Swiss-Prot record:
Positions of L-aspartate binding: 83, 171, 225
Pathway this chain belongs to: Pyrimidine metabolism; UMP biosynthesis via de novo pathway; (S)-dihydroorotate from bicarbonate: step 2/3
Name listed for the protein in its UniProt record: Aspartate carbamoyltransferase catalytic subunit
GO molecular function list: amino acid binding; aspartate carbamoyltransferase activity
Organism for this UniProt entry: Corynebacterium glutamicum (strain R)
Keyword annotations of the record: Pyrimidine biosynthesis, Transferase
Enzyme kind, highest EC tier: transferase
PANTHER family: ASPARTATE CARBAMOYLTRANSFERASE (PTHR45753:SF6), ORNITHINE CARBAMOYLTRANSFERASE, MITOCHONDRIAL (PTHR45753)
Organism ancestry: Bacteria, Bacillati, Actinomycetota, Actinomycetes, Mycobacteriales
Gene behind this protein: pyrB
Gene Ontology CC: cytosol
């Protein structure tokens, strides 16, 4: 595996292998006072973010540093991108400096694929990891979500996973649908008609407008943020009406199965798609998702950058 651009790049066995590797990293680091491994010593990793990020960027940086890599962060707002430099020239510059991997977030769908073609023609050059490209894909988020589900429930196959919210603009939902359906989960999308993607009837999912009907027997309920920064025009009448119909209230949380878990890829809008108290409830796995993000991204960097003879 040279790059990680989309969940569709991975076979079922490769997905399971990455989940297992992430669990191994967690086990190795657990209880260590100094969380440091020599696995990527001498490797150089660039994070190149054209959009804001807290969880993804900081967890990739932490993952790289815990593996002893040199991690260099570049923000588009403070680089030559601000002067008009193209994605191609930015990528080639980082490659010439000596990048072993470039982790990129970009507002344009397909940008990660383009970068990989620019910097690694014929497979020679740095690995590219897609940290989110427009509304297209966010493969590392889907992998850490699957890791969290597996840790909480013991399996993924046969589970009913209900994803609620802005499915239209979400790259997370696209990656999760691909991954969870590959691993044998039943995936249901719940949203108002205006926030479901065109062609969703051709996806390997069911879709519904009725949150209460679908979450009653759900094993996992994943809430999504309304991405107002990607919206032009009105997609729902008001925030209050949206929260009433599609928010995870205390009443809805109380009606879930005892074993059901609640997830959210973040950032959360407390009081809109999730109640303030529910966000901190024991069944809510948000902070476990964040913690797993580091171990999952360590596994990804290990697979792409460490080399075939490397050991943890």
């Amino acid at each position: 595996m040279k790059h990680l651009l989309s969940i569709s790049d991975l076979s079922k066995d490769e997905i399971v292998g990455l989940l297992d590797e992430a669990d191994r990293f967690k086990e190795v680091l657990e209880g260590r006072e100094v969380k440091k491994l020599p696995t990527l010593r001498g490797r150089t990793i660039f994070t190149l973010f054209y959009e804001n990020s807290t969880r993804t960027r900081s967890s990739f940086e932490t993952a790289g540093k815990w593996m002893s890599a040199d991690v260099i962060n570049i923000s588009a707002s403070s680089s030559s991108v601000k002067k008009g430099e193209s994605l191609k020239d930015t990528g080639l510059t980082l490659s010439a400096i000596g990048a072993d991997a470039i982790i990129m977030r970009h507002p344009a769908s397909g940008a990660a694929q383009q970068l990989a073609q620019f910097v690694a023609p014929g497979g020679n050059g740095p690995s590219v990891i897609n940290a989110g490209d427009g509304s297209h894909q966010h493969p590392t988020q889907a992998l850490l979500d699957a890791l969290t589900i597996r840790q909480r429930t013991g399996r993924i196959e046969g589970l009913k996973v209900v994803i609620v919210g802005d499915c239209l603009h979400s790259r997370v939902v696209r990656s999760n649908v691909d991954l969870l359906s590959t691993l044998g989960a039943e995936v249901v999308l719940v949203a108002p008609p205006t926030l479901l993607p065109m062609g969703v009837e051709n996806w390997p999912v069911r879709f519904s407008y009725d949150m209460d009907a679908e979450i009653a027997d759900a094993d996992v309920v994943m809430m999504l943020r309304v991405q107002q920064e990607r919206m032009q025009g009105g997609f729902f009448p008001s925030h209050r009406e949206y929260a009433t119909l599609y928010g995870m209230s205390k009443e809805r949380e109380a009606r879930l199965k005892d074993s059901a878990i609640i997830m959210h890829p973040g950032p959360m809008l407390r009081g809109m798609e999730i109640n303030f108290q529910v966000a901190d409830a024991p069944r809510t796995a948000v902070l476990q998702q964040v913690s797993n993000g580091v171990h999952m991204r360590m596994a990804i960097l290990f697979a792409l950058v460490a080399g075939s003879d490397a050991t943890i």
